[in-house]
Each structure stands twice: as C-alpha cells, then as structure tokens.
C-alpha cells in the first residue's frame, strides 16, 4: 500500500494546471449510457474513480476508448448488461449514477448499493423515490437496487432533501421519460450544470439547471456529442489552501473562480490576496492565516468537500475558529489525525472548535477518507519534520498526481510505493 512522505519546507511558489472535476466527470460518464451513439468527453482527470467507472461501463458492454491524455469516448451501443456488480460499485459512491440512465434507456437496472467515502450513512432514498415517481418499480434485494419500467413518465418531483447525485440520477432518467419532469428542491452544484450541458449537447431538453427547480422535456432518444467537463473546484480550493498555509504565491490555471466564491471569500478573510482572471486564480499569502469560521451547506454555500482542508488551515492560524459540518454526520475523522500532528481541536457532534497553534510536528498518520487525506497532506506541508501518511488510496480517488503537482510548487513530498499489499 502506497504512503506519502512529507517534510514541511516553506512557501509554495509557481503555476499549476487544474484537472477536470471528478464529481462532474463521473455523472457525465454515466450519462453516455443514455445515448444511441458514441459520446466523447474531454478534460477527464486521471483518477481511480474514473478508472473504476470505465471498468463499470465496460462490464455493462460499452466500448471505451481512451484517446490521448484527457479524452474518453464511450460507445454505448454494445451495452448488453444492466447489472452493476458489487465488486466495482463498493468502492465508489458515484456508481449509483448508472441506475437512472440504465433504467431510462434499457427499461431495467440492477445496481449494487454503493460504497464511497465513509463520511456518513449516505442513503439513496431520494434517488429511489424519485425514480418511483417517474413510474419505476423498485425493490432492494440482496444488496441490489432492482428497477424496472417499460418507459418512464415525466412528473413533478419534490425531493425530500437536497442531494447532488440524487438530482443527477433523476435529471438523467427524466431526459428519456415521456413528457415533462419538474425537479423541485434540486441541488445547484456546478457539476449539475455541467451534466445538464453534457445532456443538452446529446439532445436533451433541460432548463433551470443550477437553480432549485429543473425542468426536463423528455425526448425519444439522445445522440452522440462531445463535451468538456468543468475544472475541479475542490482540487482548486485544496491547492489554494496549501498556498495560504505555507505563505506561498501560486497561480492556478484552467480553473474557474466563479465555481468557488464561498471558498475564495474565506481565504480572503484569512488574509490571502486573491486575484482572478478568465481561467486563472492567483493567491498570495504574506502573513500567518487568520482563523476563519466555516459552516458547510449545499452550493452556493461553503462546500463540505473543503471542510477538512480549512480545518487544517485553522490548526496553524492566528486565533480560534468554529467549524460546523451540516451535511455529513461523520466527517470529522481527520480531527484525531490532525491532533497527532499537534493540532488543538475539540470536536463535539457537528461542531469543532480549533485553536490555532504556532506549529505542527510531523508524525505517522492515517488517511480515512478523500478530503481527510487532503487535510493531512496540507498539515504535512507545514509540519516540522516528517509526516508519513498511510492509506493514501483514498487520495488517489480524487487528486490527480498530487505529489507531482505539489513537488512542482516546491513541496518536499514523495510517494513511497510498496508493492506488497498489507490489506
Ligand atoms: C460523487 C459526488 O458527486 N459526490 C459528492 C456528492 O455526494 P452525494 O451526492 O452522495 O451527496 P448528497 O448530496 O446526496 O448528500 C447530502 C446529504 O443528504 C443525505 N441524503 C442523500 C441522499 C438520500 O437519498 N438521502 C439522504 O439522506 C446524505 O446522507 C447527506 O447527508 O455531494 C456531496 C455533498 O456536496 C459531496 O460531498 C460529494 O463529494
Ligand atoms: C465525498 C466525496 O466523494 P464521494 O461522494 O465519491 O465519496 C468527495 O469527493 O469529497
């Protein structure tokens, strides 16, 4: 199992290209199952979750062609199976996203209940009740969601809670339903807008994506298309925090400041100078970060996927802060690991009080989920001495070549590969 070894060594400096968004690429890949022709996706990041999704699409029968560095063409015409098996689905939450497309396009689907980051119970009731409202018969048996419908029928659905992948699944399913579907209380994340753009390029008729009411006029079929996925706002935010924590000066390219306004506001509150261009963000930090309170909530509020990174920054900030996690009930697993590095954090329920310390000290720590892992990398960048992070397979789910990108900015970080599995 690979590990990361870091030594805190001062400010990050330089330029970096941001990858395409994992959480946009995954639904777009699932959406290819809806088409009658090949769909080409560009700006796809090299990540373990993407590889898993491509394996899943191949298992269903789709022909997957990886062209060049960042392009992937999926030909859904040879799809012959509607079963998404446990072995593939267990590692990745987003695999539930094939449910809506398979059902809408093939009339049935069997998808193992998904895994993913262990940050809470993460039910899929919003997905299932929405598909039922569209006319599907759904049962959950032997760990599989089994769904059937000759043709879905458009209807008005008020989602019981704001769910990102729930909105995406219903949006995809509704594109091929008969008549109009109105999704109310929809999630407004940029990745949903991106998915709607991809589906529209395939011939879907969608309005309102990015607002809480999305209208979809069902069509008989979707055709081939080409779509480039949005930049990864969470990767962007993670590198911005890295620069802020190390007192650095970096410029991120091929990103979009409009996707992470709440994060940029918090960085400015912490004392960073942030300058944005058409597809660039430059951050300069000339002081010790000021502690900032953070409260996670659905977009456009502060993202839960940036909570752990800001907690890491608050650990070395001037003053105290309160970090409140309102989305997931178990997303403070980084607290005990940050404490091993000398952080002063008191977590109780959904709130953590962080008192900034002058310095962290390196220690062996364990990654527990994707963004928790990122927070440990950030802490390792400023800790005195060596930080050794174990179980970084979580990190590989969501960050493309993180050690190469940070090294290019001057960080002392290297991957220690161990071919012997310690399971
Ligand atoms: C692949 C992907 O895009 N993952 C993102 C997506 O996850 P995901 O789509 O799984 O997250 P949701 O938006 O569905 O979850 C939000 C909250 O609603 C709850 N809930 C959700 C569905 C449901 O049927 N019942 C229910 O109770 C969840 O347990 C959670 O407490 O959005 C999260 C919230 O921004 C992000 O952290 C994840 O990175
Ligand atoms: C929680 C995340 O991923 P997933 O929903 O795929 O588990 C994430 O991207 O931070």
Swiss-Prot record:
CDD domains for this protein: UdpNAET
Keyword terms of this UniProt record: Cell cycle, Cell division, Cell shape, Cell wall biogenesis/degradation, Cytoplasm, Peptidoglycan synthesis, Pyruvate, Transferase
Molecular functions (GO terms): UDP-N-acetylglucosamine 1-carboxyvinyltransferase activity
Active site: 117
Binding site for UDP-N-acetyl-alpha-D-glucosamine: 93, 305, 327
GO cellular component annotations of the record: cytoplasm
Gene Ontology biological process terms from the UniProt entry: cell division; cell wall organization; peptidoglycan biosynthetic process; regulation of cell shape; UDP-N-acetylgalactosamine biosynthetic process
Pathway linked to the protein: Cell wall biogenesis; peptidoglycan biosynthesis
Primary location recorded for the protein, binned into one broad class: cytoplasm
Top-level division of the source organism's lineage: Bacteria
Enzyme class, broadest EC rank: transferase
Location in or out of the cell: Cytoplasm
Residues that bind phosphoenolpyruvate: 22-23
Residues the record lists as 2-(S-cysteinyl)pyruvic acid O-phosphothioketal modifications: 117
Catalytic activity field: phosphoenolpyruvate + UDP-N-acetyl-alpha-D-glucosamine = UDP-N-acetyl-3-O-(1-carboxyvinyl)-alpha-D-glucosamine + phosphate
E.C. number(s) listed in UniProt: 2.5.1.7
Function, in words: Cell wall formation. Adds enolpyruvyl to UDP-N-acetylglucosamine.
Entry similarity comment: Belongs to the EPSP synthase family. MurA subfamily.
Protein name (database record): UDP-N-acetylglucosamine 1-carboxyvinyltransferase
Gene transcribed to yield this protein: murA
């Amino acid at each position: 199992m690979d590990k990361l070894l870091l030594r805190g060594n001062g400010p990050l400096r330089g330029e970096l290209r941001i990858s395409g968004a994992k959480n946009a690429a995954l639904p777009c890949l699932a959406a290819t199952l809806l088409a009658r022709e090949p769909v080409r996706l560009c700006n796809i990041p090299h990540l373990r979750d993407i590889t898993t999704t491509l394996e899943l699409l191949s298992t269903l029968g789709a022909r997957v062609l990886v062209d060049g560095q960042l392009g992937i063409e999926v030909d859904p015409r040879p799809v012959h199976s509607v079963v998404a098996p446990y072995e593939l689905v267990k590692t990745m939450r987003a695999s539930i996203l094939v449910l809506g497309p398979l059902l809408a396009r093939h009339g049935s689907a069997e998808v193992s209940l998904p895994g993913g980051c262990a940050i809470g119970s993460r039910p899929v009731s919003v997905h299932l009740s929405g598909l039922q409202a569209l006319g599907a018969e759904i049962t959950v048996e032997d760990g599989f969601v089994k769904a059937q419908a000759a043709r879905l029928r458009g209807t008005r659905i008020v989602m019981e809670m704001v769910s990102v992948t729930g909105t995406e699944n219903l949006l995809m399913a509704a594109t091929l339903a008969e008549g109009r579907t109105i999704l109310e209380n929809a999630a407004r994340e940029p990745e949903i807008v991106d998915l709607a753009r991809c589906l529209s390029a395939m011939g879907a008729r969608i309005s309102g994506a990015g607002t809480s009411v999305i209208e979809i006029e069902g069509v008989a079929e979707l055709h081939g298309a080409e779509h480039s996925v949005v930049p990864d706002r969470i990767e962007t935010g993670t590198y911005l925090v890295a620069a802020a924590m190390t007192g650095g000066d970096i410029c991120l390219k091929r990103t979009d400041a409009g996707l992470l306004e709440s994060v940029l506001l918090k960085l400015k509150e912490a004392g960073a100078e942030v300058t944005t261009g058409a597809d660039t963000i430059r951050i300069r930090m000339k002081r010790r970060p000021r502690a900032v309170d953070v409260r996670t909530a659905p977009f456009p509020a502060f993202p839960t996927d940036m909570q752990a990174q800001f907690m890491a920054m608050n650990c070395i900030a001037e003053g105290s802060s309160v970090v409140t996690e309102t989305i997931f009930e178990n997303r403070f697993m980084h607290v005990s690991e940050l404490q091993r590095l000398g952080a002063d954090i008191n977590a109780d329920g959904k709130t953590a009080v962080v008192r900034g310390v002058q310095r962290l000290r390196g220690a062996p720590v364990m990654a527990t989920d994707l963004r928790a892992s990122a927070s440990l990398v950030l802490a390792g960048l400023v800790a005195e001495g060596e930080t050794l992070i174990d179980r970084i397979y979580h990190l590989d789910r969501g960050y493309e070549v993180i050690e190469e990108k940070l090294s290019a900015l001057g960080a002392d970080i290297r991957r220690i590969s161990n071919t012997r599995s310690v399971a």
